Structures are given as structure tokens and as C-alpha cells.
């Protein structure tokens, strides 16, 4: 549900709750989800995924997904364990990309939290997300008129319900004088605070920040699992490691793609020679007494061309040539075959 509410990795349909009001999502049978195009592109690649056997040994499951962007920093995380706790605040996706580019260029960068619920933030003591740091988050309060205040954005970690409760409690304690509070939140937060006659709106705003959840303090603690051990890092270090990991994944994907291209080039070259030289029509091939004799004949006919192939010709290569159907041979076009080989060579050159 949290991933769906972020609108980054999951395309959601139905009632997925509301992060502003704290309303929970509908039952699973009433909601639908699918991976976004972005998620399919940056989260999944079976060729670079590390797999392990499932608990019953019948299927394989991923040890981890080959994520090619700093998901931990974009999504944020919070948890507690024996003697440990973690509170990693979410960050703006665009700012993460910009910081990653600066890191790749060897330039200095700074990262600060960004909250989906809005509000303003004081990051002077953020301490790069490490222990001992703190950030102050404020709601956005506007004056509708002299007697009415409107809260348009709520602090991170709070909902309109908890915010209203804190305002009512402050009113009961005499910290602020209000007549009533109305929650008109829909797609965006909108809480109307009606002041009692004679109450200064400026003083009321100061009181809301001082005595209610309109201003909160958050203590980040960037604790991650590194090589199966807990480690305290800064968010900048997490980004650097994520970028290095992404670069290694991209290099691995390119090498896999290059290997596939070289295999395709090798067989395309074999196929072209096999068809152009009409090896399939050789009498010795057609009258071969067994499979070994047929393979041996094709191998000997390919001998003069082996220096131009991309690797050694194996028995499996020859067996694959023998499986080419006559329809494919009849439709063979030399120009198209050469164009295909040229395109694959160009792509290999770009990878190199």
C-alpha cells in the first residue's frame, strides 16, 4: 500500500487509502495494482538477478531485485529491532537523480528530505540523515480571513485527524482560542480553524506551531544492512553506493547483451555461408550414412571460412544449421542478412 501511495513503482486502481487523512486502503479484493513502466525497467531483469531455491526446493526466487535507482532513499524506511532502530526519510526522486549525476561527474552534492504530505522543513540540523540529527517540519497555514485559518499541508508523519486532535487538546488547555475546526480534506489537505472573536490570527498561528502538531521534530537515523550486518551511514553514502551498484548492474547488462549479440553474429555468419554456398545440397551431405557423417561433412565445408567466424564452430552450431527449415532457406535474402549483421556489429561497437 505504501508503494502504491507513492505513485512511483505501482499503478493503483481503487481505494488505496489516503496519506493525508490516515484512512486505510480497502480490502485486497477491492483494489488492483500493476507494476508501472518505470518499475519494469529499473527493478526487474532475470539475467542479472541472483536466485535461490524456494523453501520447498521446487522453484527459484530472487535473493534481491537488481534495483537501478536509490529506492531506499526515494521511499524512506522505518523500523525497530533489538538494540537497533532505523528512520530513513523519503527524498525527492528528481533531486536524487541530480545528486547521482553530480556524483558521477565528481561534483559535490547535498541531499535533504522531501515529504509527500508537503509542509515546510528546517534542515539546518539534518546531519546528512545520520544519528544525532533532527529536522523540524511545519504545516502550511494560511489566513482565509481575520477569523479563519486554513491548514493546506500537514507535517510528515501526521494526518489531518491527529492534527485536529492536537488542536482540540491545545484549545482545552487554553493554549489557543478557537470556535471550531472543520476538516474539508479531499485530494488535498484543507482544515479550517475558526477563531473566537477578538483572537489575533497571527498569535493563533504562532500558538498552533508552538502547542500542536502543526510543528514536529523528526530524528533521522540511517541504519542499513550492509553485507548482512547493520551499519550506520549517511544518506550521501547510501546514494554513492546505490550509484556504484547501478553502474555495475548496467555494465553487467551490457556485457550480457554483448555476449548475446556475438552469439547472434556467429550464427548469422554461419547461416549465411551455409545457405550461400549451398552446403545443404551437397551430395555427400544428402547421402550421409549417419548424423556424425553429416556433421563432419558440414564442418569440413566450413573450414575455409572459420577465420571469419567469431568463435570456434561447435557440433551444436552444426546441428542448429541442420535444423534450418527449407522455407527459411528459400526466403533467404543476402542483402537483408548483410544488413542484419552490420546492425549487430554497430551495436557491439557502441557497447565496446
Q: Which sequence ranges carry the predicted segments?
A:
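C-terminal interaction appendages of subunits in large macromolecular complexes
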Residues: 77-80, 84-352
Amino acid at each position: 500500500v505504501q508503494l502504491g501511495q507513492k505513485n512511483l513503482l505501482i499503478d493503483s486502481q481503487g481505494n488505496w487509502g489516503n496519506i493525508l487523512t490516515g484512512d486505510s486502503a480497502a480490502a485486497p479484493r477491492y483494489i488492483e495494482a500493476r507494476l508501472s513502466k518505470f518499475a519494469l525497467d529499473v527493478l526487474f531483469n532475470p539475467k542479472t538477478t541472483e536466485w535461490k531455491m524456494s523453501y520447498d526446493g521446487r522453484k527459484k526466487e530472487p535473493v534481491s531485485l537488481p534495483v537501478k535507482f536509490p529506492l531506499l532513499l526515494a521511499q524512506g524506511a522505518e523500523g525497530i529491532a533489538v538494540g537497533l532502530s532505523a528512520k530513513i526519510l523519503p527524498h525527492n526522486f528528481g533531486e536524487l537523480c541530480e545528486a547521482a549525476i553530480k556524483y558521477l561527474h565528481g561534483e559535490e552534492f547535498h541531499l535533504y528530505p522531501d515529504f509527500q504530505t508537503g509542509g515546510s522543513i528546517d534542515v539546518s540540523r539534518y546531519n546528512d540523515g545520520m544519528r544525532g540529527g533532527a529536522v523540524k517540519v511545519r504545516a502550511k497555514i494560511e489566513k482565509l480571513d481575520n477569523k479563519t485559518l486554513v491548514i493546506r499541508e500537514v507535517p510528515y508523519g501526521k494526518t489531518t485527524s491527529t492534527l485536529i486532535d492536537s488542536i482540540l487538546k491545545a484549545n482545552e488547555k487554553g493554549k489557543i482560542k478557537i470556535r471550531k475546526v472543520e476538516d474539508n480534506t479531499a485530494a488535498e489537505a484543507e482544515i479550517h480553524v475558526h477563531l473566537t472573536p477578538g483572537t489575533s490570527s497571527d498569535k493563533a498561528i504562532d500558538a498552533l506551531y508552538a502547542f500542536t502538531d502543526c510543528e514536529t521534530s523528526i530524528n533521522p537515523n540511517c541504519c542499513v544492512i550492509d553485507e548482512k550486518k547493520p551499519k550506520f551511514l549517511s544518506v550521501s553514502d547510501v546514494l554513492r553506493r546505490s550509484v556504484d551498484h547501478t553502474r555495475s548492474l548496467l555494465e553487467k547488462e551490457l556485457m550480457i547483451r554483448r555476449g548475446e549479440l556475438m552469439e547472434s553474429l556467429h550464427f548469422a555468419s554461419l547461416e549465411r555461408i551455409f545457405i550461400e554456398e549451398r552446403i545443404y545440397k551437397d551430395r555427400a551431405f544428402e547421402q550421409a550414412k549417419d548424423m556424425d557423417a553429416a556433421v563432419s561433412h558440414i564442418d569440413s565445408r566450413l573450414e575455409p571460412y572459420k577465420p571469419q567466424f567469431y568463435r570456434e564452430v561447435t557440433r551444436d552450431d552444426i546441428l542448429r544449421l541442420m535444423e534450418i527449415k527449407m522455407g527459411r532457406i528459400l526466403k533467404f535474402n543476402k542483402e537483408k542478412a548483410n544488413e542484419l549483421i552490420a546492425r549487430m556489429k554497430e551495436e557491439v561497437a557502441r557497447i565496446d
